């Protein structure tokens, strides 16, 4: 039975989950809530048997989960992506946390009502953050070496969203630029991005100051 996902009809926190499932070739069905579906979600929220009801959610024949990182870890664990030693598992957990920091730094700016005032400071600090990630990646193809793992999709999605705000941000970081292209060139990811299922925009909720409109910046 295909897993069931639920989220808003945006990229948001669910996009890395979608990318991971597509890469793994796992079948899933997704319920997408639109801009005007808040009442629909509130009607569903406490009637699905979720322990901690929220979006995104993931339901399969063995468990019902919310919280995007928990969902990612569960799927990754089923496919042996969480490491085989305490040291490997700790390192992967560290990357997960840093990946969420990367994304949430972007998100905080995007949802700030004073977006135009605060984005300058964010963009000023961005090269330092990207340099850290470039140094961490080093000469590896993927963040944990090889093959690709769930954390690669977390970092990829953050980088892809950030480039809408700073289109040239990766030009000084060729290793990150190559990493991003490497993810996009994975056959199943490439096919997904060319399909009708792929959500290119919006990046964030419709209430966001940036990344939440009906159309991407020109």
From Swiss-Prot:
List the CDD domains.
GST_C_Mu
Keyword check for Nucleotide-binding:
no
Q: Which residues form a coiled coil?
A: none
Q: Where does substrate bind?
A: 111
Q: Where is the GST C-terminal domain?
A: 85-203
**UniProt-listed InterPro entries:** Glutathione-S-Trfase_C-like, Glutathione-S-Trfase_C_sf, Glutathione_S-Trfase, Glutathione_S-Trfase_N, GST_C, GST_superfamily, Thioredoxin-like_sf
Give compartment(s): Cytoplasm
According to its UniProt entry, the function of this protein is described as:
Conjugation of reduced glutathione to a wide number of exogenous and endogenous hydrophobic electrophiles.
Q: What is the protein named?
A: Glutathione S-transferase class-mu 26 kDa isozyme 51
Q: Which source organism does the UniProt entry give?
A: Fasciola hepatica
Q: What is the lineage of its organism?
A: Eukaryota, Metazoa, Spiralia, Lophotrochozoa, Platyhelminthes
């Amino acid at each position: 039975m295909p897993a069931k996902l639920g989220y808003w009809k945006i990229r948001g926190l669910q996009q890395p989950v979608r990318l991971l499932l597509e890469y793994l070739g796992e079948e899933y069905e997704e319920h997408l809530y639109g801009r005007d579906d808040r009442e629909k979600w509130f009607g569903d929220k406490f009637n699905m048997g979720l322990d901690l009801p929220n979006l995104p959610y993931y339901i399969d024949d063995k468990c019902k989960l919310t919280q995007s990182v928990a969902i990612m870890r569960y799927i990754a664990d089923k496919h042996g992506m969480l490491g085989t030693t305490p040291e490997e598992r700790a390192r992967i957990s560290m990357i997960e946390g840093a990946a969420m920091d990367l994304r949430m730094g972007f998100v905080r700016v995007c949802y700030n009502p004073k977006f135009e005032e605060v984005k300058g400071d964010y963009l000023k600090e961005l090269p330092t953050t990207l340099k850290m990630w470039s140094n961490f990646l080093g000469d590896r193809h993927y963040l944990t070496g090889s093959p690709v793992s769930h954390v690669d999709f977390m970092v990829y999605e953050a980088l892809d969203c950030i480039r809408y705000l700073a289109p040239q941000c990766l030009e000084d970081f060729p290793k990150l630029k190559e990493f991003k292209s490497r993810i996009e060139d994975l056959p199943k990811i490439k096919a997904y991005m060319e399909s009708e299922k792929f959500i290119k925009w919006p990046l964030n909720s419709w209430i966001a100051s940036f990344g939440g409109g009906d159309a991407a910046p020109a």
